[in-house]
Amino acid sequence: MRPYVLGLPRYANVAPLHHFLRLEGFRVLHAVPAELNRLLLSGEVGLSLVSSYFYLKHQDSLGLLPDFSVAVLGRVYSVNLFHKGALPHLARVALTTESATSVALLKLLLKEAGAGPRYERREGGLELLSAYDGVLLIGDRAIKAYAALLPEVPETPHALPTRFGEVEVADLSTLWFQRTHLPFVFAVWAYRRENPPPKALVQALREARREGLGRLREVAEAEARRLGVHPLLLQHYLWNFRYHLEEPDRLGLKAFAEALGLPFAPMFYPE
């Protein structure tokens, strides 16, 4: 019998969920969110951390773990539009190829800001600003790009700047909070309804999350070493996340669905 496959992106913001994960009889497959979305639909992955946009688009065929999320109330630091000039005046924007959720959120927010730029999918980092008015980066790439602009890391996250000369950093989660006063849910654990995860796997994920959050400084230091950035920046970053899909997070996910013109009728994993 093939082992049940768990899909995980290699991003710092999900490290508290899997850094201490102990699995027996299961296999882990690492990929970027866009690839994990495809693998879940094809059946190559049984349970995966997937983008919220993907989940909402396919919720009629997917089940949802009821107490897991990757969400933020306010600033996220790792879903950033690096741009030159005011948002309503952006003409060309380069988009990450790694995530559907961040792209959908950016288009929604820029439309509401009165912008109508031409969007192009591009691989790369801040060097793209030589040809584009804005560059959307997510995950570790966004963290490293922000760290490269930062002269030093302040003791408090409230002092982290958002302007570096002519380059501004628009944090999409902050813009969402200003719009809704709700958290933004970036990812959820989803599975195909005909292939729910074994209870032992779900319990292992809960235990790993509990240990990861209890030893968050240790997780942050490990991720900082991996990315080559200041550990204090990673601590500021990881302390912001909400990993339990609580009622405010569900309301935020529902608000995102409504903004996209999609339903929100989740089928939760049976306990």
Curated annotation (Swiss-Prot):
The keyword tRNA processing does not apply. The keyword Lyase applies. It catalyses: chorismate = 3-[(1-carboxyvinyl)-oxy]benzoate + H2O. Its EC number is 4.2.1.151. Pathway: Quinol/quinone metabolism; menaquinone biosynthesis. CDD domains: PBP2_Sco4506. Keywords: Lyase, Menaquinone biosynthesis. One of its GO terms (biological process) is menaquinone biosynthetic process. It comes from the Bacteria. GO terms for molecular function: hydro-lyase activity. Catalyzes the dehydration of chorismate into 3-[(1-carboxyvinyl)oxy]benzoate, a step in the biosynthesis of menaquinone (MK, vitamin K2). Belongs to the MqnA/MqnD family. MqnA subfamily. This is Chorismate dehydratase.
